[in-house]
Amino acid sequence: MADAEVKARVEQVYREDSRRILATLIRLLGDFDLAEEALHEAFFVAVERWQRDGVPDNPRTWLVSAGRFKAIDVLRRRARFKASRPWLLAQVEELEQAQWSDDDVEDDRLRLMFTCCHPALAADAQVPLTLREVCDLTTEEIARAFLCAPATIAQRIVRAKAKIRDAKIPYQVPSLSELPERLDSVLRVIYLVFNEGYSASDGAQVVREDLTREAIRLGRLLMELLPEPEVMGLLALMLLHESRRAARTSPEGELILLENQDRTRWDAQLIAEGGALVERALTTRRFGPYCLQAAIAAVHAEAPMADETDWAQIVGLYDVLLRVTPSPVIELNRAVAVAKRDGALAGLTLIEGILERGELQDYHLAHSARAEFCRQLGRTDEARTAYARALELTRQAPERRFIEGRLRELG
């Protein structure tokens, strides 16, 4: 195989499997930083070895093995320099005898997720740590999701890693009796991963398919472990949103708003699966925020045309959702639904009230929504100002182009 082909294959494996491999190395090594070092060393070696020997039949297993041996070398060097610490040699022996299978590599991401969401960790560190280690989001991407400073996120992640190492927090999926109390954090992580994939906060594309696929895969794994209503609701929500992926952008990569999408391009199979999960979850009458959001998505999916959407039902569902989970972002979404039901002025009044409280001043979608309703009402100067503020806050290229187009239309 030519050098360029090998390098391309290594890059592909890194994109698709590096976080799975890292999760297994963290389980084997019990040390995030050592596992990260071993991972990168393994991929570095792969470029040379695969050019010489060919790409192995199972690249993931090969890379786990290579990473393990690199870690053993590091630990042996540490043991020589720290002869007074015999536990290092014991760690080397334990690592040399460690066994794993390719199935472990799949399951280890779920194990790592539960470890990162362990109740012994600070609540404000659990989700950022999981997004960083399990899903490879950067601290900047995580900070944007939490509307806070990257340095703050980085500090939380460092402290959480140290806590896992020092407290020897177990690397395992909890027992069935422990699962329910550990569920909320894990659901939140999967939801944030999907959201970052469904509407990437940065970059040249609207969607990051690697993240949406991974979130759905983890949701399905969680359903097998614990088929609770909120697990069903989250999986349904992701499937219903994913069903619209093909229609959300033009062939040129331009953003298409929901009301302008070609609904014949929506995935009927995903809609059917998601809708069935919503019905199943709601019949339990033990539903929460994910079930309610999935129910809203299902109402959208049921409408054959945008102007046939049951906005009254959607507003009603948002009313219930706000009682269950008060949130300014949910208020914003409800305001948009109210505008669809009662007119742009009704929605704009609600959005301006939210912005006056200051909670969404740095949230680009709030300013975009305000701009759109000002535009519809002929308040051109206000629309232009709001779109300009949204543009300042937007990093994703298709969203920026969409806003720039609106500004050009306004003159």
Predicted segments, located by residue:
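Arg/Lys-rich amphipathic alpha helix in sigma70-family domain 2
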Residues: R68-P86
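Amphipathic alpha-helical interface segments
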Residues: A23-T24, L28, A38-R49, W62-V74, ...
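Amphipathic, Lys/Arg- and hydrophobic-enriched alpha-helical face
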Residues: V13-F32, V45-R49, F114, H118, ...
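Residue at a conserved register position within TPR or TPR-like alpha-solenoid repeats
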Residues: L239, A298-E302, V338, C374, ...
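A short, charge-rich alpha-helical start-of-domain segment used by transcription regulators
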Residues: A2-A23, D33, P180-R188, L192
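Conserved RNAP core-binding helix
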Residues: F32-Q51, D57-V64, P86, C135, ...
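Amphipathic helix-loop-helix modules that constitute alpha-helical solenoid scaffolds
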Residues: R78, R85-D124, T130-E141, C148-D319
